[in-house]
A protein has these predicted regions:
Chain B
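N-terminal cofactor/phosphate-binding cores enriched in small/glycine residues
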Residues: 17-80
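Fe-S ferredoxin-like electron-transfer domains
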Residues: 54-206, 210-236, 251-254
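Catalytic alpha/large subunits of respiratory electron-transfer oxidoreductases
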Residues: 107, 163, 168, 224-673, ...
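Long, low-complexity segments enriched in small/aliphatic residues
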Residues: 555, 562-570, 720-814
Length: 462, 919
């Protein structure tokens, strides 16, 4: 029987629904019965009969790249667990989906939690983790309740606990709730938080949690969507899965489109098989009436902004416009940004870029954990300066000083938050410098050091 | 130029340099270019790399002209051939920009700031060349209020630069976890406890945070980071056997503040509130400043000459009338080796008697005795440093976080890193929540428990056959004893389920290396020496002797209790532990001192009291010990002192003991004199006078030397290094010790020629040849047998962090504001039965006497057990303790006292107490 979706929420014909197959599906509930009727946990049964290394090899062969933001190959990550390891191995599902512009994992957690559990139990089996944690952000209280219920159901059916399905493999999963901090999405910050500590990201080395992570044991941290893909990789086989999408950019991924389009929302597409232009015009029904595209943040708020009239030179020598960029990892990187978490933010010509960057700077100043000096102080100064630009009280020089603050954060912090908070500012200024300077008072040129600042610098202030 | 990149070579700005395996980039640069070449705000030598300030950033590349990366040097491991660029234009700009950001939220009142001239932020700002702050002012934290709640610790968080050094010092150095960061980003700020003041938080005032803080954000009332001092003198703390090194800042004859040297092997930038802050007693108005002579029952101030004459006359008379055996001396574990040496020489040579003892009698005499019997040496077999290498820690009858705070912290740090800890103690001490095993036995049953512990090691087959066979003797008897144990009876006796004992025993015996620490909870029992020997048995049967990370380590109580015994302040052994009744030794001593000496063992302290009461001991000389407050059964001690014809006391203050004296001589404190202390790991360390003796006082060594000369006993003028040279000639294990070669770090004895020390004893063979096993069957204490029916509670006593012994010194410092009285811990069940609530005044009484103090309801003790401390003369707890003592050494049984307890009705309280209650 054909799958029926709620009216008005039917997938677009250009979509390829793997992960979101059951989202908005008529009659499908988060209960295990729904999931089992749909063939749920069959892949777990298959996987439990496989060699552990064979599962890892299938995931490697699938070419699956992490869907949380960095796009790191999942199978390779699993392979980082030291072969000589004697400590327990942990898997953590990063369900701290907090990148502005991203809203895919919440649908999986809310509507199809067993898909995640099945993928995660297979992953646990593959890396021999007997304990896994699902770290759910504070802002998803319902998700935590739903997933906990799902875990109880799975346990009752023998998909979790001791000797799962007679395989001899024991596994337990637990939900851990965050307390409302963006930094907990950073994997080492998340691990610290899970250990009950302040979520300060860890210094390197150790370079990967897979070597030393939770409780100083090997730990795999995967995004919700990434873990869901594991189930489908087992079902299809790695090689078959790799045929989805484009080479090195395999499978499907969920794009979360927001902003000034007719139909914002989530769209699961084969990676690289649709272009930005198709996302806007075909999937999302085009820009709002009478409006023109101005800029796009293509992969969550931390990715660098793209200008509507930019031309991008690719490795093969082609020069393409913004609408021609295929929605994949590598081309997006070649265009100077990143596919990131799949959060595509479309901005039309009604939007003030000064306002947008100020909005982002406010977010990052609020979310800096405060551990590293450049980020703690710098993110606040970016906010303060862009506050001033937005209020029209700034000197055009402020735009340059804003850029210089961003430059001294990038690459100078323990975790990638430094980049996450400085890339937007750097790219917005690079691409919209004139507009931002235009929002300032030209008569203040040369006056960016305020009187108080001058006094302070002379060491005379109280 | 060295170009061998296969080995440990890397480049600093193009210059090839050797590095050590495990170096971070910063450590490497620090070593070759000096600390500070690369500036940093969050890194500190005593803390783990943190990487947060990023000021220490450098560029690194794998080829000189290869692509460069910016990394924080403090946490980046160095690799062979790495090129490090410490001051490229990019790096200089980066550092300047970071410091500029910090300065946007820092008050610029540098000239009036207490750390001006010694502020790391100031230095770093100067080094990176900040000339302006480009950012207009905005939100800041300049108005944060100061915390002045605590007698020592202060904070002024407007000066905080969020480097987290204080938080890390609290976690990594002290292990107290009081400080933490609250809020995030720009709102992140340091809090104490649950955002409390220092005073209200659980801070133990160790000051590690203050010392670690690069600014004055966290400091202390003594401004210990200011550069006001004109001199800094390195010396050794006088408070406990850890032997912390101290850097004492002075101006003229005023002691300004104390910090812990970063390079000290003993305490690595750390010390406790006693060492760091409790020094104000030095110039306390109560200090004795003139000799006092008792005429007709009243003290009269006298000159030193008058006092010496009076003493010499009386001692001479008593010697002539009653013989030298009518004179005795009690030396002091608080004094230097040189002073102790002279004291025993004075008594032995001057009076031809061996009636010389020291306060080790009442603490670790069973350790010295027991370990000599088992190993041949009555001292720690290993060093505290061995904690770094051990795989298991056993603590029996000790509370190191209170009694030996720096060692306690080190143990806690190791345990937090995963080393299993076994605690054998009747109380739930601070380390218990960290411990894997807590065997909470009934006080006084150590032998029963440790026998069972040994039995389970044997049963599990975890003995080291090879070690036993090659290195030990008398195993068969010991094994037979264990095999004959009645486990049911043992279990009933000590009250710990046998499975728990078994698990702990297996933990200890299966560790690759295990260290056994013990304290006064082992020694101050009627079977103290036997317990020490049983601990030695357990170490030997598992081969835990003679290598790194193992051993038997007594936590010596006083700063120089090891030294006092080493120097011969014991009635049975002279300087260097030579038995006085051995003919050869006797001859050696007589020849060395050129005097007629006694070859009969003298009286131990408790025997001296009995002799005094029997009229046999007529004169007693006490150097720096308050026996009335600290020895058991106070009334007995007092009557003994009253029975003496002549008592001389050398003291800092008019103590309850000094009150009984005929002559009181005002002595100088540790900050006012030089000499050496020997800590609990046999480390002989130089004590350097920080200020001259306060006017009117003299060092104890000077006093003893003066009186010796006055009485015609040959003795060269007093100099600490001169006496040390004499010691080196008679004490075998001091042979290579000279003042110079002890160095700043001290040297662990035996000290061989050239000043070479010994970290681990009994490496290839035991001092006594073969290690000897001893089996002892548990015997109930007579105190319990005699008095338990009438007095059904067992009182056990101990110490707290804030006060030292009878508190003569600490009660005259800010510590007295932190802890103001002794409290009696009582289990809630017992309290309920007796109708006692926390804060109630209770009466504790035994068949010796009674004492009143406030109760504290606590589950740290089991039902039937009471616990208190003995720091305050107002609560003279030794009124109730007994004269029972260790059979071998006469160390008093402070830890098992049969008492009863009852609530004191309000009307029968002293008036002052009632007033306080009403208020």
């Amino acid at each position: 029987m054909a799958i029926q979706y709620i009216s008005g929420k039917e997938p677009h014909a250009r979509e390829k629904r793997l992960i979101f197959k059951n989202i908005d599906r008529v009659g499908f509930t988060p209960s295990i019965d729904s999931f089992l009727e749909d063939g749920g946990y069959e892949q777990l049964k298959v996987a439990l009969k496989m060699e552990k290394s064979a599962i890892i090899n299938e995931v490697k062969a699938s070419g699956l790249r992490g869907r949380g933001g960095a796009g790191f190959p999942t199978g390779v990550k699993w392979g980082f667990i030291p072969p000589t390891n004697t400590k327990p191995v942990y898997i953590i599902c990063n369900a701290d989906e907090s990148e502005p512009g991203t809203f895919k994992d919440r649908y999986i957690l809310h509507q199809d939690p067993h898909q995640l559990l099945e993928g995660m139990i297979i992953a646990c089996f593959a890396v021999n983790a007997k304990l896994g944690y699902i770290y759910i952000r504070e802002e998803f209280p319902q998700a935590a309740i739903i997933v906990e219920k799902a875990i109880a159901e799975a346990r009752a059916k023998g998909f979790l606990g001791k000797d799962i399905l007679g395989s001899g493999f024991d596994c337990e999963l637990y939900v851990h709730r965050g307390a409302g901090a963006y930094i907990c999405g950073e994997e080492t910050g998340l691990i610290e938080s899970l250990e009950g500590k302040r979520p300060y990201p860890r210094i390197k080395p150790p370079y990967f949690p897979a070597a030393l992570g939770l409780y100083m044991s090997p730990t795999i941290v995967n995004n919700v969507e990434s873990l869901c893909h594991v189930k489908h990789i087992i079902q299809m086989g790695g090689a078959e899965y790799a045929k989805l999408g484009t080479p090195n950019n395999t499978g499907t991924r969920i794009l979360c489109v927001s902003g000034d389009v007719q139909k914002p929302g989530y769209y699961e597409v084969e990676v690289g098989k649709v272009t930005m232009g198709e996302v806007i015009d075909v999937l999302c029904g085009g820009m709002k009436p009478g409006r023109k595209l101005k800029a796009i943040i293509p992969g969550g708020s931390s990715s660098k902004v793209l200008r509507a009239d930019e031309k991008f030179k690719l490795k093969d020598g082609r020069e393409i416009g913004i609408m021609d960029i295929p929605m994949d990892f590598d081309t997006m990187a070649a265009c100077g940004s990143m596919a990131g978490s799949g959060g595509v933010i479309i901005m039309d010509d009604s939007r003030s870029m000064t306002w947008v960057i100020n909005n982002l700077n406010n977010f990052y100043a609020h979310e800096s954990c405060g551990q590293c000096t450049p980020c703690r102080e710098g993110s606040l100064w970016m906010k303060k300066i862009s506050d001033r630009i937005v209020s029209g009280e700034a000197s055009p020089d402020d735009v340059d000083s804003l850029e210089s603050v961003a430059n001294q954060i990038e690459g100078k912090t323990i975790c990638a938050f430094g980049e996450a908070c400085s890339w937007p500012t750097q790219s917005f200024i690079k691409k919209f410098r004139d507009e931002m300077k235009g929002d300032c008072k030209p008569e203040l040129v040369g006056e960016i050091v305020s009187d108080e600042g001058k006094v302070a610098a002379a060491g005379l202030a109280a | 130029m060295v170009q061998d990149l296969s080995t440990l070579t890397a480049f600093i700005d193009g210059e090839p340099m050797r590095f050590n395996d495990g170096d971070t980039v910063l450590k490497f640069i620090d070593r070759h270019r000096g600390r500070g070449h690369v500036p940093t705000l969050c890194d500190a030598p005593q803390l783990e790399p943190y990487g947060a300030c990023r000021v220490c950033s450098v560029e690194v590349a794998m080829q000189e002209d290869g692509p460069r990366r910016v990394v924080a040097s403090c946490h980046t491991p160095l690799t062979a051939g790495m090129h490090v660029f410490t001051e490229s234009p990019k790096i200089r700009k980066l550092r300047r920009n970071i410091v500029e950001l910090v300065l946007t939220d820092h008050p610029l009142d540098c000239l009036t700031c207490e750390v001006s001239g010694n502020c790391e932020l100031q230095t770093v700002a100067a080094k990176v060349g900040i000339r302006q702050v480009r950012y207009p002012s905005g939100a800041n934290h300049l108005n944060r209020s100061k915390d002045r709640s605590h007698p020592y610790m202060t904070s002024e968080l407007s000066k905080c630069i969020n480097c987290s050094r204080c938080v890390r010092a609290c976690d990594e150095v002290q292990g107290q976890h009081v400080l933490s960061m609250h809020g995030r980003g720009f709102n992140a700020r340091i809090i104490k406890g649950l955002d409390q003041s220092f005073m209200d938080s659980t801070c133990v005032s160790c000051g590690a945070c203050s010392q670690a803080c690069p600014t004055s954000a966290i400091s202390d009332v003594f401004f210990s980071k200011s550069i006001e001092a004109t001199r800094k003198t390195r010396t050794v703390c006088t408070y406990c056997g850890v032997g912390c090194n101290l850097n004492v800042a002075t101006k003229g004859s005023e002691v300004l503040s104390i910090q812990a040297p970063t390079d000290s092997e003993v305490n690595h930038s750390h010390t406790c509130l006693k060492g760091r802050y409790a020094f104000k007693f030095v110039k306390h108005p109560d200090r004795l400043r003139k000799p006092l002579i008792r005429y007709n029952g009243h003290f009269t101030e006298a000159t030193w000459e008058e006092a010496y004459d009076y003493i010499a006359k009386n001692l001479q008379r008593i010697k002539e009338e009653h013989g030298g055996n009518a004179v005795g001396g009690i030396s002091s574990a608080r004094c230097t080796n040189e002073e102790n040496y002279l004291m025993q020489k004075f008594i032995r040579v001057g009076f031809g008697t061996n009636n010389i003892d020291a306060c080790a009698r009442v603490c670790h005499s069973p350790t010295a005795w027991g370990m000599q019997k088992a190993f041949g040496t009555g001292a720690a077999t290993n060093s505290i440093e061995d904690l770094e290498y051990t795989n298991c820690i056993l603590i029996t009858g000790a509370n190191p976080t209170e009694g030996h705070p720096v060692t306690g912290s080190k143990i806690k740090q190791r345990v937090m890193k995963g080393v299993p800890l076994i605690v054998i103690d009747p109380r739930e001490i601070e380390l218990v929540p960290y411990a894997k095993h807590h065997l909470q036995l009934r006080p006084g049953t150590n032998v029963a428990l440790l026998d069972m512990f040994a039995y389970y090691i044997l049963e599990a087959g975890l003995i080291d056959q090879d070690f036993i066979k090659k290195r030990c003797e008398n195993w068969e008897e010991f094994e037979q004893g264990l095999r004959n144990l009645n486990l049911d009876e043992s279990e009933r006796t000590h009250g710990v389920p046998r499975e728990k004992v078994r698990a702990a025993a297996i933990e200890y015996a299966s560790a690759k290396g295990a260290m056994a620490f013990h304290g006064l909870g082992v020694t101050e029992h009627s079977h103290g020496s036997k317990t020490v020997m049983t601990i030695a048995d357990i170490a030997m049967m598992t081969g835990n002797i003679g290598r790194p990370g193992v051993g038997v380590l007594p936590l010596r109580g006083q700063n120089n209790v090891q030294g006092a015994a080493d120097m011969g302040c014991q009635p049975h052994q002279g300087a260097g532990y030579l038995q006085v009744n051995d003919e050869a030794n006797h001859k050696l001593y007589e020849e060395f001192y050129g005097a007629h000496m006694s070859n009969e063992i003298g009286w131990k302290i408790p025997q001296m009291y009995d002799a005094a009461l029997a009229g046999k001991l007529k004169a007693l000389w006490i150097m720096g010990e308050d026996v009335v407050q600290t020895d058991p059964n106070t009334e007995h001690v007092k009557s003994a002192l009253n029975a003496l014809e002549f008592l001389v006391v050398q003291e800092l203050f008019m103590t309850p003991t000094a009150e009984f004296a005929d002559v009181v001589l005002p002595a100088a404190s540790f900050l006012e004199k030089s000499g050496t202390f020997t800590n609990g790991e046999r480390r002989v360390q130089r004590v350097n006078a920080v200020i001259p003796p306060i006017p009117g006082t003299k060092s104890d060594g000077q006093i003893v030397c003066d009186i010796m000369q006055r009485m015609g006993i040959p003795q060269a003028d007093y100099t600490p290094d001169g006496v040390l040279a004499e010691i080196a000639r008679i004490v075998p294990f001091f042979k290579g010790a000279t003042w110079e070669n002890l160095t700043d770090q001290g040297t662990q004895w035996p000290i061989k020629e050239g000043g070479i020390g010994t970290e681990i004893l009994h490496v290839d063979s035991f001092k006594r040849g073969l290690g000897k096993f001893h089996f002892f069957r548990f015997q109930e204490s007579k105190e319990i047998e005699k008095h338990h029916d009438e007095f059904p509670f067992i009182l056990t006593t101990g110490r707290i962090l804030e006060h030292y012994n009878c508190g003569t010194m600490t009660r005259r410092t800010g510590n007295a504001q932190i802890v103001t009285e002794d409290l009696l811990a009582i289990h809630p069940d017992d309290a309920a039965k007796k109708g006692i609530e926390s804060g109630d005044m209770v009466r504790i009484f035994s068949n010796r006497g009674e004492v009143n103090m406030k109760a504290k309801i606590s589950t740290e003790v089991k039902p039937g057990i009471l616990y208190t401390t003995f720091h305050f003369p107002e609560n003279l707890v030794n009124m109730v303790t007994s004269s029972e003592c260790d059979e071998d050494t006469m160390c008093p049984e402070y830890k098992v006292v049969a008492v009863d307890v009852e609530k004191v009705p309000a009307s029968s309280m002293p008036k002052k107490q009632r007033m306080m209650e009403i208020a």
